């Protein structure tokens, strides 16, 4: 079998798949369009660009996201290696310096000498080699048309991106540094609100002008990236029980919890940029500036990046992909990333890892493998390939069945993955 593998898209899934292949000595051609045409959400030419947030979520094993990471580390995940090496303080969450993280992934892959980058917009797989389609949820153009022909169409949902402000424009006479419940190393800046300030903020937010998006449907909003204005419209106190909840945060000036609080998290290692946590939005840019400057401590905020919203698409994986994320009607084509129906940075990378591992085995004439179903990786892959009605899914303990002792479940899953790795891991290429 030809040892050359083509990957369309150098996002988290495509980059992770490439890493698993080059680790085993195989040549990879990455087809990336960003130098020719950028999607609405990308800004640089580096691989593995983070869009929605700079947080890869929890590292705690009692959290499903933490378990997912721990399992992937067993297989030598490039995404996690670069994430940990370029992390910024964020309590129990793994947050990264976006630019340095993407640069790390790019350099690691190119330094192998086995990766060739072709800057082009691919319309469809055009050789008989193995192809991985990892173009992400904003796939469009001729390639989207080709995928639609092969799969019967796309499902859609919408998500959004939060704004970033400059650190020097934050008024620390008003804001204060604290972590929820005192857990962490002072990783968040908090903007406290009184009841009057909150109510004014809410009133202005629900009446602010938004950017009209073609075919926008509130029913298609993804839960974890709900625009702040949509949360606000669902009820006057909805934000106080969501991203603006004050529970566990004490204002040192009053010794009490504020009525509401907006948190800011470091965006880069130097701490010169902060993103507004949970403030994904589709407000018009002028309105964003006006609303953000209503937040106590951000009266003179310099906005370095405005929030945006975009449509995400994914295929009907249970219908069109096999258990290895391979197109049933075209066995030389695999899919990876959010286009398969997973949701989240790390989940996306995991599918790339899975596909990269299995293509390595396929080229070597070995049987492909399925992660054990009682691992988080295995449960996620099983869900997206068997769900009766596929909805975007992120790591959660519900996928592993019942049981209240999450730590016990996680340790058992981790032990199972370690044993599976010892039995099935490849030792070629190094």
UniProtKB/Swiss-Prot annotation:
GO MF, one annotated term: tRNA (uracil(54)-C5)-methyltransferase activity, 5,10-methylenetetrahydrofolate-dependent
Cofactor(s) needed by this chain: FAD
UniProt GO BP: tRNA methylation; tRNA wobble uridine modification
Localization per Swiss-Prot or TrEMBL: Cytoplasm
InterPro entries: FAD/NAD-bd_sf, MnmG-rel, MnmG_N, TrmFO
EC nos: 2.1.1.74
Pfam families: GIDA (PF01134)
GO cellular component, one term: cytosol
Keywords, alphabetical: Cytoplasm, FAD, Flavoprotein, Methyltransferase, NAD, NADP, Transferase, tRNA processing
Catalytic reaction list: uridine(54) in tRNA + (6R)-5,10-methylene-5,6,7,8-tetrahydrofolate + NADH + H(+) = 5-methyluridine(54) in tRNA + (6S)-5,6,7,8-tetrahydrofolate + NAD(+); uridine(54) in tRNA + (6R)-5,10-methylene-5,6,7,8-tetrahydrofolate + NADPH + H(+) = 5-methyluridine(54) in tRNA + (6S)-5,6,7,8-tetrahydrofolate + NADP(+)
Binding residues for FAD: 9-14
Primary localisation category: cytoplasm
Function, in words: Catalyzes the folate-dependent formation of 5-methyl-uridine at position 54 (M-5-U54) in all tRNAs.
Protein family according to the UniProt entry: Belongs to the MnmG family. TrmFO subfamily.
UniProt name for this protein: Methylenetetrahydrofolate--tRNA-(uracil-5-)-methyltransferase TrmFO
